[in-house]
């Protein structure tokens, strides 16, 4: 059996800790034979465990402690610590592993709830489970979210080779915002969401680049954001914004501009991968 979980981008600018979008990069987990102990084969490196301390196995065992150990093989296109939901993908893969082997028959809603409990909020985990675009909130321990189709457009991901830990990126954020600024930040997010619902990527893109919640604070850690925005704007893109906590920057553009933008971004003197992606519509899947 095979489990496949997509990457995700969170925030989309002003949709801070609320908006998430599934992307066509994947964590894939092949479930092999039963074994005496858990072992997860991978070539990711970076100190990621091969035993039951791996997040995937740990998550599965928290849900189903009596699971029979298996040999697992993980391949992952999602680079860690780049703002593309790698930790959320691992958590969701663990939930799917337990659900499959223990025949828990969890609903998608239950999977989102469990994953959001582990991750703290649903902005990455909900699209990883459900696919497409999700707007969510965690209030008094309860998850509220809406899944909707995202407008058709090209997505160009500028993924620096250097990592940026979420903890470091969150560390530069203020504890509070002045009331007047928070009202303005909220109104910007509201217009962005309404524009997306109306398939108006021109207006949505304008709002994406006017975030007041987090990007101006994180820009000191991601100096290439301004460069990418200049390139994107000059070539007719809708917007460029941080993917999650960064350092990845995601460019939204008309499809006919995708290849030109990719080529232009590849010429920047920053060590990075520049990938053409799409919205992933299905979310986590199990292939038997």
Swiss-Prot record:
One of its GO terms (biological process) is threonine biosynthetic process. InterPro entries: GHMP_kinase_C_dom, GHMP_kinase_C_sf, GHMP_kinase_N_dom, GHMP_knse_ATP-bd_CS, Homoserine_kinase, Ribosomal_Su5_D2-typ_SF, Ribsml_uS5_D2-typ_fold_subgr. GO terms for cellular component: cytoplasm. It holds the Pfam family GHMP_kinases_C. Pathway: Amino-acid biosynthesis; L-threonine biosynthesis; L-threonine from L-aspartate: step 4/5. It is found in: Cytoplasm. It catalyses: L-homoserine + ATP = O-phospho-L-homoserine + ADP + H(+). Its EC number is 2.7.1.39. Keywords: Amino-acid biosynthesis, ATP-binding, Cytoplasm, Kinase, Nucleotide-binding, Threonine biosynthesis, Transferase. ATP binds at residues 79-89. One of its GO terms (molecular function) is ATP binding. The keyword Transferase applies. PROSITE patterns: GHMP_KINASES_ATP. HAMAP family: Homoser_kinase. Belongs to the GHMP kinase family. Homoserine kinase subfamily. PANTHER family: HOMOSERINE KINASE, HOMOSERINE/4-DIPHOSPHOCYTIDYL-2-C-METHYL-D-ERYTHRITOL KINASE. Catalyzes the ATP-dependent phosphorylation of L-homoserine to L-homoserine phosphate. NCBIfam families: thrB. This is Homoserine kinase. The lineage of its organism: Bacteria, Bacillati, Bacillota, Bacilli, Bacillales. The gene is thrB.
């Amino acid at each position: 059996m095979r489990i496949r979980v997509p990457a995700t981008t969170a925030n989309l600018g002003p949709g801070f800790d609320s908006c998430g979008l599934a992307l066509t990069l994947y964590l894939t987990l092949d479930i092999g034979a039963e074994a005496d102990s858990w072992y997860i084969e991978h070539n990711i490196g970076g100190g990621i465990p091969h035993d039951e301390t791996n997040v995937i196995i740990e998550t599965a065992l928290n849900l189903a402690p009596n699971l029979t150990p298996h040999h697992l093989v993980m391949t992952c296109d999602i680079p860690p610590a780049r703002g593309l939901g790698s930790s959320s993908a691992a958590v969701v893969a663990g939930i799917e592993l337990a659900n499959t082997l223990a025949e828990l028959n969890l609903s998608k809603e239950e999977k989102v709830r469990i994953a959001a409990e582990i991750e703290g909020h649903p902005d990455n985990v909900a699209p990883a489970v459900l696919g497409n675009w999700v707007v969510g909130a965690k209030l008094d321990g309860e998850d509220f979210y809406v899944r909707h189709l995202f407008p058709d457009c090209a997505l160009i991901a500028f993924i620096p080779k250097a990592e940026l830990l979420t903890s470091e990126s969150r560390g530069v954020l203020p504890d509070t915002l002045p009331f007047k600024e928070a009202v303005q930040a909220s109104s910007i997010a509201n217009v962005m969401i309404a524009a997306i619902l109306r398939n108006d990527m021109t207006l949505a893109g304008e709002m994406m680049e006017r975030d007041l919640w987090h990007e101006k604070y994180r820009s000191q850690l991601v100096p290439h954001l301004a460069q990418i925005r200049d390139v994107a704007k000059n070539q007719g893109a809708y917007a460029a914004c941080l993917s999650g906590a960064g350092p990845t920057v995601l460019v939204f553009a008309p499809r006919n501009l995708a290849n030109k933008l990719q080529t232009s971004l590849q010429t920047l003197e920053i060590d990075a991968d520049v990938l053409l992606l799409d919205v992933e519509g299905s979310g986590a899947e199990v292939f038997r």
